[in-house]
Amino acid sequence: MLAHMPAARTFLQHPDPLTREIAEGYAGGSFLMDNGDGLRWYGVPGRALVPLTEDAGLHVARRMRRELKHFRPSVDLAFDEVIAGCRGHLPGSPERDGEWISDELVEIYQHLHTTGLAHSFEVWQGDELAGGVLGLALGGAFIAESKFHRLTNGSKAALIHLAEHLDRQGFALLDAQIQNPHLATLGVYEVTDKEYRRLLRRALALDVEL
């Protein structure tokens, strides 16, 4: 009988070499970016983490809480569209933070999506894609690579819905990588690299599914 393998170990020991390489890099605390000089591994001294609940520090203004009801969340329903939105390639996606996502990295994300490591989290208004988050799920850690919105508050709604979804699924960590003023309004906070790696190790040991 095969031994049960926690989700993170599934990718760290994956038969596909690329999936295994990427999983090992993220499990070690690094992340991929292309800042115009080729694809490289990066790390930052202060890692931005999103609280998963309001009790843990997630800030959801009363008006935003009311607006959330108008955004319908989903997982992996529009992966290619979310990548395009993050790159600013979708009509009406003014806010994006994925200009660093090169064509090569798009191909990697698409490959990782087929092996189950890369995911999209979307929010919709009716049949219209309002915003989304692109990321990797490894054990109980979700590493958010990029986000975008097409409708007002779309990226904010996506991140809040994602945090609450991860909490329900038993995840322990939502990593936003790099802090910015927009994230700070949601209660996103920074931890040192040493603390991040400690939290990441604990999250990787969890056997949860997105």
Curated annotation (Swiss-Prot):
Major subcellular location class? cytoplasm
| InterPro entries referenced in this protein's UniProt entry, alphabetically | Acyl_CoA_acyltransferase (IPR016181), Leu/Phe-tRNA_Trfase (IPR004616), Leu/Phe-tRNA_Trfase_C (IPR042203)
> What class does this enzyme belong to in the EC scheme?
transferase
**Database matches in Pfam families:** Leu_Phe_trans
Q: Which reaction does it catalyse?
A: N-terminal L-lysyl-[protein] + L-leucyl-tRNA(Leu) = N-terminal L-leucyl-L-lysyl-[protein] + tRNA(Leu) + H(+); N-terminal L-arginyl-[protein] + L-leucyl-tRNA(Leu) = N-terminal L-leucyl-L-arginyl-[protein] + tRNA(Leu) + H(+); L-phenylalanyl-tRNA(Phe) + an N-terminal L-alpha-aminoacyl-[protein] = an N-terminal L-phenylalanyl-L-alpha-aminoacyl-[protein] + tRNA(Phe)
Q: Which GO terms describe its biological process?
A: protein catabolic process
Keywords for the protein's UniProt record, in alphabetical order: Acyltransferase, Cytoplasm, Transferase
Molecular function GO terms recorded: leucyl-tRNA--protein transferase activity
* EC number annotated for this UniProt entry: 2.3.2.6
Q: Does the keyword Transferase apply?
A: yes
Give its localization.
Cytoplasm
GO-annotated cellular components: cytoplasm
**Entry function:** Functions in the N-end rule pathway of protein degradation where it conjugates Leu, Phe and, less efficiently, Met from aminoacyl-tRNAs to the N-termini of proteins containing an N-terminal arginine or lysine.
Family under the similarity heading: Belongs to the L/F-transferase family.
HAMAP family, A to Z: Leu_Phe_trans
UniProt name for this protein? Leucyl/phenylalanyl-tRNA--protein transferase
**Its encoding gene is what?**
aat
